[in-house]
């Protein structure tokens, strides 16, 4: 009888090992970050390396580019962060901080990996100058419209003066 019981126990262990083997890939899959989660981790890294007084928080995340399924392959990312009211020395999550009024905005580009165990990123951030580019476009369009309106006014004055001058019949 002892042998029969030992056989059942060995079968139980075999079944347990089989189930464990089947569940291991699921545990590995669970370590893959979403695109946004990987970007948020990169922002945490940016905040840790920053010499600025306050934390930065995600303001805008560009759409996820089409990517391969390998979580270890670096994925291109681009996003915008904005300065918050929370000091960098706080233990608070940037997501819990309000944006600072007129806070510094930075445009960030680089790569992240989605494998949580590897957790690598290569991101560089620069002051966002798109606001100033928009301002330049505004003045360019305004100058063009003013120029077109000025030409129309000059043409109306010419037409008016043409009608005032008496015509001489030849």
Swiss-Prot record:
Gene3D superfamilies: 3.10.450.10. It is found in: Secreted; Vesicle. The keyword Secreted applies. InterPro entries: Cathelicidin-like, Cathelicidin_CS, Cathlecidin_C, Cystatin_sf. Keywords: Antibiotic, Antimicrobial, Cleavage on pair of basic residues, Disulfide bond, Immunity, Innate immunity, Secreted, Signal. One of its GO terms (cellular component) is extracellular space. GO terms for molecular function: lipopolysaccharide binding. Residues 150-162 are annotated as: Active core. Disulfide bonds join 86-97, 108-125. Residues 1-30 form the signal peptide. Residues 31-131 form a propeptide. Proteolytically cleaved by proteinase PRTN3 into antibacterial peptide LL-37. Proteolytically cleaved by cathepsin CTSG and neutrophil elastase ELANE. Belongs to the cathelicidin family. This is Cathelicidin antimicrobial peptide. It comes from Hylobates moloch (Silvery gibbon).
